C-alpha cells in the first residue's frame, strides 16, 4: 500500500478528530467534553487535536458545520405562496429541534450560549443572521414578486424559530410546536412597512481593466455545489461584520457571489458554514430553486479569492467588490457602499487602489 502524503495524513487525522469530537459532544455536551477524551477516541495525541483545531470551541463549530452540511434532506413539496413557503420552512426547522434528535444532549444545544459568551462570535453571528434573513426574504420574493420586500418578514420568522429553538433546549415540552409553524405562516400577512431605500452612499467605483483569475473553485454554501467564478457578475468580498451589504448588489439585478472572509478563519469560518447550511436545509424544502436569488455564498478561509480580487489582506470589517465581464475586472470599489456602487455605478475614469484599512 502506498504511503500517505503529509496532506493526506493530515486530512485523515482531521476526519478522525471530527468523528471523535462528535461522539464526545453528543455524549457529554460541549461544556463537559474533554479534549483528552476526544484524542483518546481518535487514537491520536492531544497535540494532534490542537494541530487541526485551535481550541474546543473551534472544534465544536466544525463538528456542527460538518453535521449540518451532510444532513439528509427529505423530499417535500415547496410552497407556491409566501404563506405556504413560510409554513414548510418552519416545519423543516422544528423537525430539527433538540427534542426531535436521537443524541442524548443534542449536538447543537450549546451553540447559542457559546456564541453569546464572546464578542468575537456575537458580532459575526449577528451578521450571519442578517445574511440568512436576506437570503430567505429574497427567496420569498421569488415566490411572489408582487409582494414587495420581504426581508423583515424573514427576520420575524427567523426570530420566532430561533426563539422556539432556545425554549426547546431550556424548557423542553413547553408550548405546542406546531403553533410556531402556524405563527410563521401568519407572518405572510404582516405589514412590516418594509421598503428598499435608495442607497445614501455616493461611492464611485473605479474603472479598471485587469485579468480575473480565481485560484480555486469553491463550494457554494447555499447549494452545496461547486461555484466556478468564471462568469460575469459581481464578486463581493465581505468580512463577517459586513454581510448584510450583499443585498445592495443583489437588488441591483446582478449575478452576485459573496466571498466571506474573516481574520479568525479556524473558528469563525465553521460558524459561517454552519449558519448557512442550516438555512439551506430548510430553504431547499420550502422554496423552489427557481425562486432563489441570484446569489452564491462561498467561504474564503485562507483569503485566496480576496487576494485574486486585489485584496492582499482582508478582515471582518472588509467590504469590497469587483465587477467581472468576459474574464476581466472592469470596475471595483471598497468601503461602505462598495457592493451597490460596483453593481450599478458608472465607472470612474481612474483606478482606485485598494485600501485595506478602509471599512
Where are these regions (language model features)?
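Generic hydrophobic, amphipathic alpha-helix propensity
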Residues: 13-21, 38, 63, 67, ...
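Helix-turn-helix
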Residues: 16, 24-58, 62
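Hydrophobic alpha-helical connector segments
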Residues: 75-105
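Amphipathic alpha-helical segments used for helix-helix packing
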Residues: 99-119
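Hydrophobic/aromatic-rich alpha-helical bundle segments in the mid-to-C-terminal region
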Residues: 126, 145-188, 195
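Thiol-/selenol-based redox modules, centered on thioredoxin-like
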Residues: 186-191, 309-325, 330-359
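Short, internal strand/loop/helix patches
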Residues: 278-317
Amino acid at each position: 500500500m502506498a504511503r500517505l502524503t503529509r496532506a493526506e495524513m493530515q486530512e485523515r487525522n482531521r476526519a478522525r478528530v471530527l468523528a471523535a469530537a462528535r461522539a464526545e459532544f453528543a455524549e457529554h455536551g460541549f461544556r463537559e467534553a474533554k479534549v483528552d477524551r476526544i484524542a483518546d477516541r481518535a487514537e491520536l495525541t492531544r497535540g494532534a487535536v490542537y494541530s487541526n483545531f485551535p481550541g474546543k470551541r473551534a472544534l465544536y463549530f466544525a463538528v456542527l458545520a460538518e453535521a449540518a452540511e451532510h444532513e439528509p434532506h427529505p423530499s417535500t413539496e415547496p410552497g407556491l405562496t409566501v404563506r405556504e413557503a413560510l409554513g414548510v420552512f418552519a416545519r423543516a426547522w422544528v423537525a430539527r429541534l433538540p427534542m426531535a434528535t436521537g443524541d442524548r444532549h443534542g449536538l447543537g444545544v450549546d451553540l447559542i450560549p457559546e456564541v453569546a459568551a464572546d464578542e468575537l462570535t456575537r458580532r459575526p453571528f449577528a451578521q450571519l443572521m442578517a445574511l440568512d434573513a436576506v437570503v430567505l426574504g429574497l427567496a420569498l420574493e421569488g415566490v411572489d414578486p408582487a409582494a414587495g420586500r420581504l426581508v423583515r418578514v424573514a427576520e420575524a420568522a427567523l426570530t420566532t424559530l430561533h426563539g422556539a429553538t432556545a425554549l426547546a433546549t431550556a424548557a423542553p415540552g413547553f408550548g405546542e410546536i406546531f403553533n410556531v409553524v402556524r405563527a410563521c405562516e401568519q407572518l405572510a400577512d404582516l405589514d412590516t412597512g418594509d421598503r428598499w431605500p435608495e442607497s445614501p452612499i455616493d461611492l464611485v467605483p473605479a474603472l479598471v481593466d485587469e485579468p480575473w483569475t480565481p485560484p480555486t473553485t469553491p463550494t457554494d454554501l447555499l447549494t452545496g455545489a461547486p461555484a466556478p467564478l468564471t462568469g460575469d457578475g459581481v464578486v463581493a468580498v465581505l468580512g463577517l461584520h459586513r454581510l448584510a451589504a450583499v443585498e445592495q448588489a443583489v437588488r441591483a439585478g446582478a449575478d452576485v457571489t459573496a466571498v466571506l472572509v474573516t481574520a479568525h478563519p479556524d473558528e469563525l469560518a465553521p460558524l459561517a458554514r454552519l449558519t448557512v447550511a442550516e438555512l439551506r436545509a430548510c430553504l431547499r424544502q420550502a422554496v423552489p430553486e427557481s425562486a432563489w436569488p441570484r446569489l452564491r455564498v462561498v467561504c474564503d478561509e485562507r483569503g485566496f479569492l480576496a487576494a485574486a480580487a486585489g485584496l492582499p489582506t482582508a478582515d471582518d470589517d472588509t467590504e469590497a467588490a469587483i465587477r467581472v465581464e468576459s474574464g476581466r475586472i472592469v470596475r471595483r470599489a471598497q468601503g461602505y457602499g462598495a457592493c451597490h456602487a460596483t453593481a450599478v455605478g458608472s465607472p470612474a475614469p481612474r483606478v482606485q487602489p485598494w485600501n485595506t484599512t478602509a471599512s
